[in-house]
């Protein structure tokens, strides 16, 4: 099977922006990069439901489905697409210091169960390259401008 013939997986995620246009990122444990809360859906699970479930599992943040703006599906890596949703939150609505991850995976070092995400932050769009994975930074740079998304969410 050629590389392009392999089935593409789809992760569903939520791009959270605050009133200032900063994006909410979560640090992927045992890596150097930060990410948006996202993950694969369960069989039969709608993309919005998968995105909200992953958000809750990876951050402890619960949002109402009606708040989500469906941004659609984006090519992310050679083997994966992202189905993304966006939401704007009010100032102070999400405190990164209060977030917690309940989704665990085995550590590459010793096999002990550790949280998928271990830290949280608000980041201005100009600093995305310093924090996000190359794939996510490229997506925000080429296909989904955070500045334009902020304008869209605020109606500006």
Each model region followed by its residue ranges:
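Short, P/G- and charge-enriched loop/turn segments at secondary-structure junctions
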Residues: 1-4, 71, 106-111
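Conserved N-terminal beta-strand and adjoining loop/helix that marks the start
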Residues: 1-23, 43
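Short hydrophobic/aromatic beta-strand or adjacent loop that forms the aromatic wall/cage
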Residues: 9-13, 80-84, 117
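Conserved Nudix-box catalytic region and its N-terminal flanking loop in Nudix hydrolases
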Residues: 18-61
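Residue-level detector of high-confidence beta-strand sites
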Residues: 26, 71-73
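A generic structural signal for short hydrophobic patches within well-formed alpha-helices
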Residues: 41, 128-129
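A short coil-to-beta-strand element that immediately follows conserved catalytic motifs
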Residues: 62-71, 95
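Active-site-adjacent beta-strand/loop module that shapes the phosphate/pyrophosphate-binding cleft
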Residues: 74-109, 121-126, 139-149
